[in-house]
Amino acid sequence: MHVKKDEIVVVITGKDKGKQGKVLRVLPKENRVVVEGVNVVKKHTKPSAKNPNGGIIEMEAPIHASNVMSLAKIEAKKAKKKG
């Protein structure tokens, strides 16, 4: 994988293009990553011991790793282009 957990990344394609966030989880077998604040979906949950009322919870869904790029890599490209 070209990104690691806790790394800051930028979404380069898709509906969340341009958004930045921290990588919360890496799923190497599926080639996907979960990024904070990106690809937020609403999940309907049944009542449980943890959440007695159940309800609708907003959570981040995984996106394909090819749709994100490390912020450090982008900064390096800008510096190379500038100087």
Swiss-Prot record:
UniProt key word RNA-binding: yes
Domain of life: Bacteria
Signal peptide: none
This protein's GO CC annotations: ribonucleoprotein complex; ribosome
Example GO biological process: translation
GO MF term (any one): rRNA binding
One Pfam family named in its UniProt record: KOW
NCBIfam families membership: rplX_bact (TIGR01079)
Family under the similarity heading: Belongs to the universal ribosomal protein uL24 family.
Quaternary structure and interacting proteins, as annotated: Part of the 50S ribosomal subunit.
Biological function: One of two assembly initiator proteins, it binds directly to the 5'-end of the 23S rRNA, where it nucleates assembly of the 50S subunit. One of the proteins that surrounds the polypeptide exit tunnel on the outside of the subunit.
Protein name: Large ribosomal subunit protein uL24
Gene symbol of the encoding locus: rplX
